[in-house]
Amino acid sequence: VAFDEYKVKPQKGDLFMTRIGDIGTCAIINSNDDLAYYVTLSLLRPNKRVLNSRFLKYVIESKYGKKELNRRILHTANPIKINLGDIPKIKLYLPSLQVQEYIVSILDKFDTLVNDIKSGLPKEIEERQKQYEYYRERLLSFKKS
């Protein structure tokens, strides 16, 4: 079967979101390569003029996003799932694109610090070293009598 026969092809910047089982886990598509995906995933294509893909990912994976998804889950299904038609019903607060990009830049930095052992761990060690030196100097600085 040729990819041309499919209605929707994933594009760079789109998101895959799990919709069966572990609902709401997202991945951003980083290339325009032809991809096939299974029914357990939904393809989300944000309107780039009003919605940043990374912002959408962070919102969906937040407590708020999980709560919104949970309101539309078919809890009687086994495994639990959300219907494709219910995904657009999720209520999202959309700040301006500029604010979204600012929020994403902050969250990306935290994500790197927490999840990237090559940059996060050395940065954490450096910060703890500074903290140690600060407290050492404070604790060992005695007033002259």
What are these regions (language model features)?
Residues 1-145:
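Charged, alpha-helix-forming regions
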